[in-house]
């Protein structure tokens, strides 16, 4: 399985508090496999699964594993929360062994996760597990902390369903072109990935067609604001038709009539 680096954060702890910097690939000494684990199970069962943490650096690292809740906002941004705060979290039902460990250079550790699935569980639940290194001293007096995460989905297949709707379609003329804003809402109880397009028509003829970015994530009961940028339009009246593929049996569509002045 391909190793993945997901949500990597490099923290530089200086004399003026916490500063976040973007690491280069040379800075990263830890990776995890898999970056996303999907566990299909049944209510009331206990399950155990491994996540492999590998030290790719030239020196030993000390790592602490911890769970976190999260939400994905309408623009795709992640917000983290303490374990057990989210209604779709199983943080309190998951145990980690070992929680703290050392890894020698070029070696790896398999960390075991056990989950006691509640008897009334339905649909899909999600968590992040962070693997955080002990601060190490670098040049300039900074202490460097590396943090990398793996995403965990616990899925009850018999009660999982996907669904979606378009709540609104709007358009906005900006300097870089015509922006088509599509509000998608996940009406199911599992995460989905979006694709699709907008078609702009005038007098029955298609004058522009814009594809959405691929693989936009919308978590259970979440929302996504899709921003598709097309060419500038000449003044006039147009019809905008948005079509979203969320992985269900049919596309969902929304339409708006706009006037460009």
Language model region names:
Residues 50-54, 114, 179-187, 229:
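Short edge beta-strand/loop segments characteristic of extracellular beta-sandwich folds
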Residues 101-108, 215-223, 260-261:
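Short proline/glycine- and polar residue-rich coil/turn motifs
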Residues 28-34, 57-110, 195-198, 202-208:
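Surface-exposed binding patches on compact interaction domains or structured appendages
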Residues 56-59, 71, 119, 186-190, ...:
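Short, acidic/polar linear motifs in exposed loop/turn regions
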Residues 37-40, 96-103, 153, 169, ...:
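Beta-strand-rich interaction surfaces with strong enrichment in secreted/lumenal proteins
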């Amino acid at each position: 399985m391909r190793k993945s680096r997901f949500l990597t954060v490099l923290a530089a702890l200086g004399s003026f508090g916490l500063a976040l910097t973007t690491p280069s690939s040379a800075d990263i000494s830890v990776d995890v496999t898999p970056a996303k684990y999907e566990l299909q199970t049944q209510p009331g069962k206990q399950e155990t699964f491994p996540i492999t943490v590998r030290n790719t650096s030239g020196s030993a690292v000390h790592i602490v594993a911890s769970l976190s809740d999260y939400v994905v906002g309408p623009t795709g941004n992640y917000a983290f929360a303490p374990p057990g705060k989210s209604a779709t979290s199983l943080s309190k039902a998951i145990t980690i062994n070992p929680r703290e460990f050392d890894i020698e250079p070029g070696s790896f550790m398999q960390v075991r996760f056990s989950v006691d699935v509640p008897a009334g569980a339905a649909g899909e639940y999600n968590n992040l597990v962070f693997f955080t290194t002990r601060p190490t001293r670098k040049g300039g007096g900074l202490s460097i902390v590396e943090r990398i995460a793996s995403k965990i989905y616990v899925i009850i297949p018999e009660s999982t369903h996907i669904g979606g709707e378009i709540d609104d379609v709007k358009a906005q003329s900006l300097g870089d072109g015509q922006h088509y804003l599509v509000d998608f809402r996940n009406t199911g109880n599992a995460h989905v990935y979006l694709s699709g397009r907008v078609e702009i028509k005038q007098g029955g003829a298609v004058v522009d067609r814009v594809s959405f970015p691929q693989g936009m994530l919308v978590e259970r009961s979440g929302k996504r604001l899709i921003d598709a940028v097309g060419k500038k339009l000449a003044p006039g009246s147009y019809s905008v038709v948005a079509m979203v593929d969320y992985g269900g049996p049919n596309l969902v569509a929304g339409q708006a009539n706009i006037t460009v002045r």
